[in-house]
């Protein structure tokens, strides 16, 4: 590793979820505070960090492919520092070093804020593995944000659920909620820098506060996601607040009412349902029924009729019959989601479902995924149709990389929208502006339109 006065450049590749993206921003901030600068290309970097995901096997295999390329590079460039962070690192630990001996540092997601300390150990000539359970300290790190308009703020780490297909609890640890004032302080700092939108993040965000002490006079927990939203809503300068990812088991009417009543809360909800069949949900150990999920959606649409809904779903779970799969298709059509992230079941290490003997063959997985993706796209296109001819408030996030004359941004309902950077009065719009856009054209997953004079 290079001496501190000659740190050189770094490159971070992020796989997986929004939590990983937020972790990568923090680690980039640490590296830049140490004197590193971002490289112009991965193969030019003096330090390469892969922040990894193990939710699905294909993401994990992609990491090993990337590592093989960098390991070969390190054999001719011993000054290269090679780091694997995130969930694959946590899952594999020291076995990663045996598989890729060129690695300098293997670190689980709970150790993201310790990157400088761990690299100092690498400086001293050690190969370092940091995967032990660790209490996550407050986010005192100044993150290097990928956007100057929209930011992530972690509010709870880890997950206490035990879904039979999911590896997250074993790699991200138990739930650890941050204190409300610390979260608000971070949001105030971002707003002071000009950020307009914050997404509050948690693997299971509506479980926020379960591990914090305190009971209200009414007998409920003192700290909940609903209370947190009320606490941070008055941050000056912020225009929008979102949160993800929700679990139906903890999604309450009180939370829905807060989203409807607090003006900065966006009318977009990401609530995975995973299956439209109760027996499959029971086998997954999800802890709710299809009927409960429907009640949540009905309540959201009662309070916010135009709210957008997105979800995650798994097809070809072990033992899933054709009839059970058809119930999932029916639920998607019934609810009319704006977007659904789909996946065929992938056995993951250290999960109960991976050991069951009723795994479905690959051809069924491929066919069910193909069919459900076609349905999801059709539903998305139909849902997007309601925007045609409407005027929507769009937060401009930056230039359309495919057309520099356009800006791109999102509606409050999270619809990606493209529009001219120049208004009818020759006004030039820029990132951070809230623009009223007349929607001229709709596609399955995006909108385009014309900015109106404000």
Curated annotation (Swiss-Prot):
Required cofactor names: [4Fe-4S] cluster
HAMAP family: tRNA_metthiotr_MiaB
Cross-referenced InterPro entries: Elp3/MiaA/NifB-like_rSAM (IPR006638), Methylthiotransferase (IPR005839), Methylthiotransferase_CS (IPR020612), Methylthiotransferase_N (IPR013848), Methylthiotransferase_N_sf (IPR038135), MiaB_methiolase (IPR006463), rSAM (IPR007197), rSAM_horseshoe (IPR023404)
Catalysed reactions, semicolon-separated: N(6)-dimethylallyladenosine(37) in tRNA + (sulfur carrier)-SH + AH2 + 2 S-adenosyl-L-methionine = 2-methylsulfanyl-N(6)-dimethylallyladenosine(37) in tRNA + (sulfur carrier)-H + 5'-deoxyadenosine + L-methionine + A + S-adenosyl-L-homocysteine + 2 H(+)
Keyword Repeat: no
Keyword set includes Transport: no
Localisation: Cytoplasm
Cofactor-binding details, from the entry: Binds 2 [4Fe-4S] clusters. One cluster is coordinated with 3 cysteines and an exchangeable S-adenosyl-L-methionine.
Full protein name: tRNA-2-methylthio-N(6)-dimethylallyladenosine synthase
């Amino acid at each position: 590793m290079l001496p501190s006065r000659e740190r050189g450049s770094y490159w971070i590749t992020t796989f997986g979820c929004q939590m990983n993206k937020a972790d990568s921003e923090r680690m980039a901030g640490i590296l830049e505070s140490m004197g590193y600068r971002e490289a112009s290309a991965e193969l030019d970097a003096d330090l390469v960090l892969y922040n990894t995901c193990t939710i699905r096997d294909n993401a994990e295999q992609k990491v090993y492919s990337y590592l093989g390329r960098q390991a070969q590079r390190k054999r001719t460039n011993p000054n290269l520092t090679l780091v694997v962070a995130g969930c694959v690192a946590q899952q594999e630990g020291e076995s990663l070093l045996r598989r890729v001996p060129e690695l300098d540092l293997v670190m689980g997601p709970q150790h993201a804020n310790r990157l400088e300390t761990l690299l100092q150990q690498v400086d001293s000539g050690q190969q370092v593995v940091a995967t032990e359970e660790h209490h996550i300290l407050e986010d005192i790190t100044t993150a290097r944000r990928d956007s100057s308009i929209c930011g992530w703020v972690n509010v709870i780490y880890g997950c206490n659920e035990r879904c039979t297909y999911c590896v997250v609890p074993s790699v991200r640890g138990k739930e650890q909620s941050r204190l409300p004032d610390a979260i608000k302080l971070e949001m105030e700092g971002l707003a002071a820098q000009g950020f307009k939108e914050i997404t509050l993040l948690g693997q299971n965000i509506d479980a926020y506060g379960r591990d914090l002490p305190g009971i209200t006079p009414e007998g409920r927990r003192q700290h909940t996601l609903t209370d947190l939203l009320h606490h941070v809503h008055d941050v000056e300068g912020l225009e929008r607040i979102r949160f993800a990812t929700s679990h139906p088991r903890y999604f309450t009417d009180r939370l829905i009412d807060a989203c409807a009543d607090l003006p900065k809360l966006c009318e977009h909800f990401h609530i995975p349902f995973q299956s439209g069949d109760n027996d499959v949900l029971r086998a997954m150990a999800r802890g709710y029924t299809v009927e409960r999920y429907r009640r949540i959606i009905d309540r959201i649409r009662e309070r916010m009729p135009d709210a957008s809904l997105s979800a995650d779903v798994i097809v070809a779970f072990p033992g899933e019959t054709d009839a059970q799969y058809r119930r999932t298709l029916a639920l998607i059509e019934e609810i009319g989601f704006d977007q659904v992230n789909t996946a065929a079941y992938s056995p993951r290490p250290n999960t109960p479902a991976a050991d069951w003997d009723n795994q479905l063959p690959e051809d069924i997985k491929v066919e069910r995924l193909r069919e459900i993706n076609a349905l999801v796209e059709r539903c998305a296109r139909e849902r997007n149709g309601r925007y045609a001819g409407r005027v929507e408030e769009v937060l401009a996030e930056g230039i359309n990389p495919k057309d520099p004359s356009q800006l791109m941004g999102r509606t409050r309902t999270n619809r990606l929208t493209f529009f001219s950077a120049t208004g009818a009065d020759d006004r030039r719009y820029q990132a951070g502006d809230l623009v009223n856009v007349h929607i001229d054209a709709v596609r399955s997953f995006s909108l385009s339109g014309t900015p109106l004079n404000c």
